[in-house]
Amino acid sequence: MNKLFALFLLALCFCGACSYTLKIKDGRTAYERKQFAVAVPMLEKEVAKAKTRVERGQLAYLLGDSYRRTGQDKRALTWFKTAYDNNYGADALKAYAFGLKKLERYAEAREAFKNLGIEIGSPYEYRKEITAATIAEDWLKQAPANGWKLEDAPFNSAQNDFAPTYFADGRLVFTSDRAMAKSEGNYNWTGQKFMDLFIVEPEAASPQVFDGQLNTGGNEGTACFNMAGTTVYFVRAVGAYKGDDAFCKIYLAQKSSAESAWNDPTPLPFQKEKINYLHPALSADGNTLYFASNDPEGWGGYDLYSAQRNAKSESGWDEPKVLSRNLNTPGNELFPTLDADTLYFASDGLPGMGGLDVFRTYKSERNAWAPPINLKSPVNSGSDDFGFLPTRGAKLPAATKPGDLMRSGFLTSNRTGTRGGDDIWRFEQRVPPLKPPQRDTAPTKPLAYKLLLEGYVLEKILTAPDDPNSKVLGRKPLAGATVVAEAAGGKKQTFTVKEDGFFKMEMGESTDYTFTAALAGYLSNNAKFSTKGIAKDPTNPTQTFEIEIVLDKIFRNREIVLENIYYDYDKWDIRPDAEPTLNRLADVLRQNPGIRIQLGSHTDCRGNDGYNQTLSQRRAESAVNYLISKGIEGARLAAIGYGETQPADPCACARCTENEHQINRRTTFKVLE
């Protein structure tokens, strides 16, 4: 997935790009260590010296991606085009197409997405992007009549300033990596300071550092406060394992009065290891916290959650709940903010203009979330738009005639015209000019509410069709699969998909569904959908949702590498960061009760042969035991340790790079006959 993220989301949650440069001698190494600001000047020189077309294409892609990750989209686009012209392939064209969309060059983007679908052999894959580009063009044309006015806030810097929230006294607290930030060195991802919290009067031009008790030399950001200003929730990046990426956690700090000092911040107790928690937003009564998380048990990507305070609970909180499926998508939902009963958030999974777009929703009388509404242009653009903050406590007279002020506030965007990367923008919306009345002589009919689901069964397009470990280029419809739709309570419907892989059905209200797809020669798979929490919308009585079910081809007796399974040195215990991968494998086995698998463990060439053999056998057995603990029958599982006998990269041991050693250290599974 090549979605466009806000710079903060990408950069804050990683420590591989810390302020030291180690012994980086070339741009590729800097890129691999996520030190993108360091990589750019190195790669520019290396591209110019490239001796072959292949090398030039590879380096141009890394340079384009480094520019993209540091918020320099126009330069990124140039180098993605150079990479594609030098035979880098579909990845470069994909980055180029999304870059065109982000820069609002929609006609060119449509053509690029069309060519991309042809190149990977699946016009299906980018059909939504082509449609979205057409819709975004129309929204741009309609923008002047929408009554919105945006202007750059006076306190922005040449760096990144974003996600404002209100403090108790009406001042704004926002996140920035400007020169005033507390860190001594620069963050090599961005080339700027680490991120801190700042405070400013809304009309002022000179913000101040918020509080030394909360800001550290690392990354802090995106805060929210209770109405009294005595409780703050904010995000801090924390390293869980030495040498690994950091993970973002939400911290709580309190003070006894407005004049006293903050106590030491503590992480909220319900947060899991190796999962990011971002962008807290607090209800007016201080009892409900909304936030974003990439918990794998959600709907996909980053989802919006709510957590309720509970004084009777040992932790002080109820277990967080993921918000309904009509808000959350397989993409990313982020930056929630609240205004009375209205929830604003950003999404790149709902239909939008390019990057993150701002949406609004509200709770209906049945306490369900209404379908989200895209705020369109000019609130949204091809770039990332997020952090929508209406003016607190604004008591406006009834806006009844054209020109009357309807709402005002702030939002964040990295669109063209910003001073730096992300900027905070002030907005006003006024009543637009009246449209001529239209006569409607048709009799009024009772609304017929429907919840429709459109599903697609797909298979992966592999670079090498006979190699399950080769790169995935995309997906294409899979003809002939059978889909069983089962509602909670036992009611079932069965579909057989044709060449387009498509099926469609009407769903009931407040119902959980499981959709299971199967086809001979493929591993069965399922997808879940719930209509719980979806409100009826008189302006959109027929709501249509979409799911995709991807089936993997069965490669019998072929080892398939399991990603993200790592072990501590000289250990064979299953680490928490390996559990999601093994949990997914357990799901595959539950959905395919007729298969047996072998789990294999490989080491690199360093160390004694016998030691490596024993260690790898113990690691394979640990993986098997974990699956058994998840309810998989031991008779369906076999464990074998290969030691260093079957390297994936047969480099000469004394000359193997660290990357080659890492390729050889792997855990695999294969379906047995």
Over which residues does each language-model region extend?
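Short, conserved micro-motifs composed of acidic
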Residues: 21, 33, 95, 102, ...
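Periplasmic peptidoglycan-binding/tethering modules of Gram-negative envelope proteins
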Residues: 434-596, 657-658, 673
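Periplasmic OmpA-like peptidoglycan-binding domain that tethers envelope proteins to the cell wall
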Residues: 347, 352, 592, 600-673
